[in-house]
UniProtKB/Swiss-Prot annotation:
GO terms for biological process: translation. Coiled coil: none annotated. Keywords: Ribonucleoprotein, Ribosomal protein, RNA-binding, rRNA-binding. One of its GO terms (molecular function) is structural constituent of ribosome. This is Large ribosomal subunit protein uL3. SUPFAM superfamilies: Translation proteins (SSF50447).
């Protein structure tokens, strides 16, 4: 599996064949291989990659990076691999750049949506609310949530006010429009979850469209 970490820069548009296409610009990589995990010791195949250099680091992480002979990195994530043959193609300290992807390729993007705090049912779930009339006693309340005599309770899992946003979301099969290797920029068709500057994970698609 191909994967790289990045930061969302923002959205703009490109004109291709006189057609306006909304795109998202992501600054992705370079990432560095910090650790290799094999089935004999760890029980599975994976590599640990780091992203964004860090000035200050605690003692345990300092030893971890010193063993890999790479500079301290802010973010660490694992890439699961299928077998040891794929694991052998990576080396500790190896740099992973955007050249692993090509324009026209499909990718999956994982990000964290904007956190909107404690929100009511209308904003969080799109409830219609009550009548907007003078005689109405409620305008933005949830209304009837359960039954009266039987079962005389509200079932668990009912949509109610609560924390809205800040959830991990994956968008599948976004098309790579353009790649700028010199500036580590990736241009993707459509929108990507998260605020500007938030972490995103770009990886090869789990499922392909027929």
């Amino acid at each position: 599996m191909k994967m790289i970490l990045g930061r969302k820069i923002g959205m703009t548009r490109l004109f291709i064949n006189d057609v306006s296409i909304p795109v998202t610009v992501v600054r992705a990589g370079p990432c560095y291989v910090v650790q290799k995990k094999n089935p004999q010791i760890d029980g599975y195949c994976a590599i640990q990659v780091g992203f964004e250099h860090l000035k200050r680091v605690n003692k345990p992480l300092e030893g971890h990076f010193k063993k890999a002979q790479v500079k301290p990195l802010r973010l660490l994530r694992e890439i699961r691999l299928e077998d040891e043959n794929e694991l052998d193609s990576y080396e500790i300290g190896q740099e992973i750049k955007l050249d692993i992807f090509q324009p026209g390729e499909k990718v999956d993007i994982t990000g964290w949506t904007k956190g909107r705090g404690f929100s009511g049912g209308i904003k969080r779930w799109g409830f219609s609310g009550g009548p907007r009339a003078h005689g109405s006693k409620f305008h933005r309340e949830l209304g009837s949530l359960g039954q009266h005599t039987e079962p005389a309770k509200i079932f668990k899992g009912k949509k109610m006010p609560g924390r809205y946003g800040n959830e991990r979301v994956t968008i599948h099969n976004l098309e790579v429009i353009k790649i700028d290797l010199e500036n580590n920029l990736l241009v993707l068709k459509g929108s990507v979850p998260g605020a500007r500057g938030s972490l995103v994970i770009i990886k090869s698609p789990r499922r392909t469209r027929k």
